[in-house]
C-alpha cells in the first residue's frame, strides 16, 4: 500500500445488523458508499467499531465482499485482524481472502499482557508471514498493554511492511516521541477523534475515525484543514462536533455511533451483539439534541 493513501480521514466502519442479529448487508453497502461519497480517504472494516470480536469467520468474508463491491475501487480498504495467540493469527491472515485489501490493522495482543519484547516479536512474526501492509493499533484502554514508542520505532525500522500506527493511547508525548524518531515513510494516525487536531499538530498525518461514520464530509474537512496547517478553521469544526464525539463513548463504542446512524436513517436497525448493548435512553436523548445543534448550523 502506498503510505500516502493513509493521510487524511479513514472511517472505522460499523457493522450493521438486522432485527434478527444477522449482518445487514444492504445497510452496510449504503453506509460504505456514503463514506466514500462524503470524502473518506479510506475505509477500515472489521475493527473495534465494526464489533469484530462478535463476527464469525464466514461473516467476515461476506462483509469484506460487500464493502469491496460498495467501494468499487474508489478508495483503499483496510481490514482489522488481531489476536493474542500469534500462531493462530498468522494462520488466519494467511487464509484470509485479501482480494482488494490494501492493509491489515492489527491490534496489540490483549488480555495476556505480553512484555514489550513479546509485542515486538508478535508483530515481527506477523510482518514476516505476509506481504500485505500492516498498521499497528495501540489502544491500551482495551488491550491492557501499551505499545511503547521504543517498540513502535523498532518495528518501524525492522519491518518494511509495517507502515504505520493507529495511536489510541491518548498520550500526546508518546505520539511526539514516535514522530521525532520514526523512519520517514512510517505514518502516525490518531485513534481518537477528539485528539486528532492535537496529534496532527505533533506530526500525525490523519485519523481512523468513529464520528466519520455519520459526518464524513464534515470530519474529513476538519482533518484536511489540519493537514494544511489551517488550525483555526479546523478548531471551529472541532467545537461543533466535540459534544457528539464525547457522546459516542458514554455507553461504549459502537453503541453511540450506531444510535446516531439510526437516528439519521443511515442504518435500518439499532442492533448490537451481546455483550454490547444499545445506548441508554438518556444518552439517545442527548445524541438527538446535539445532532440537532450540529445539523442546524
Swiss-Prot record:
GO terms for cellular component: cytosol. One of its GO terms (biological process) is diaminopimelate biosynthetic process. Its EC number is 4.3.3.7. Keywords: Amino-acid biosynthesis, Cytoplasm, Diaminopimelate biosynthesis, Lyase, Lysine biosynthesis, Schiff base. PROSITE patterns: DHDPS_2 (PS00666). Pfam families: DHDPS. Pyruvate binds at residues 49, 208. The keyword Lyase applies. Gene3D superfamilies: Aldolase class I. One of its GO terms (molecular function) is 4-hydroxy-tetrahydrodipicolinate synthase activity. SUPFAM superfamilies: Aldolase. The record marks 48, 111 as: Part of a proton relay during catalysis. Catalyzes the condensation of (S)-aspartate-beta-semialdehyde [(S)-ASA] and pyruvate to 4-hydroxy-tetrahydrodipicolinate (HTPA). Homotetramer; dimer of dimers. HAMAP family: DapA. This is 4-hydroxy-tetrahydrodipicolinate synthase. It comes from Porphyromonas gingivalis (strain ATCC 33277 / DSM 20709 / CIP 103683 / JCM 12257 / NCTC 11834 / 2561).
Amino acid at each position: 500500500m502506498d503510505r500516502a493513501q493513509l493521510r487524511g480521514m479513514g472511517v472505522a466502519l460499523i457493522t450493521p445488523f438486522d432485527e434478527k442479529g444477522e449482518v445487514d448487508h444492504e445497510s452496510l453497502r449504503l453506509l460504505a458508499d456514503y463514506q466514500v461519497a462524503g470524502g473518506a480517504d479510506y475505509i477500515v472494516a472489521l475493527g473495534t467499531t465494526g464489533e469484530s470480536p462478535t463476527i464469525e469467520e464466514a461473516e467476515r468474508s461476506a462483509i469484506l465482499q460487500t464493502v469491496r463491491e460498495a467501494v468499487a475501487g474508489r478508495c483503499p480498504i483496510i481490514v482489522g485482524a488481531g489476536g493474542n495467540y500469534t500462531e493462530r493469527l498468522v494462520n488466519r491472515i494467511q487464509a484470509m481472502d485479501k482480494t482488494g485489501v490494501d492493509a491489515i490493522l492489527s491490534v496489540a495482543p490483549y488480555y495476556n499482557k505480553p512484555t514489550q519484547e513479546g509485542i515486538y516479536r508478535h508483530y515481527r512474526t506477523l510482518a514476516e508471514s505476509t506481504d500485505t501492509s500492516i498498521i499497528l493499533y495501540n489502544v491500551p484502554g482495551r488491550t491492557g498493554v501499551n505499545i511503547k514508542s521504543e517498540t513502535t520505532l523498532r518495528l518501524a525500522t525492522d519491518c518494511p511492511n509495517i507502515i504505520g500506527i493507529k495511536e489510541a493511547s491518548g498520550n500526546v508525548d508518546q505520539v511526539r516521541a514516535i514522530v521525532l524518531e520514526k523512519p520517514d515513510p512510517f505514518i502516525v494516525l490518531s485513534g481518537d477523534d477528539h485528539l486528532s487536531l492535537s496529534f496532527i499538530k505533533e506530526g500525525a498525518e490523519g485519523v481512523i475515525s468513529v464520528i466519520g461514520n455519520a459526518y464524513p464530509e464534515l470530519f474529513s474537512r476538519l482533518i484536511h484543514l489540519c493537514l494544511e496547517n489551517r488550525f483555526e478553521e479546523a478548531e471551529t469544526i472541532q467545537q461543533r462536533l466535540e459534544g457528539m464525539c464525547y457522546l459516542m463513548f458514554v455507553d461504549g463504542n459502537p453503541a453511540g455511533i450506531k444510535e446516531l446512524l439510526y437516528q439519521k436513517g443511515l442504518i435500518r436497525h439499532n442492533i448490537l451483539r451481546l455483550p454490547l448493548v444499545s445506548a441508554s435512553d438518556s444518552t439517545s436523548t442527548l445524541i438527538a439534541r446535539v445532532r440537532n445543534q450540529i445539523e442546524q448550523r
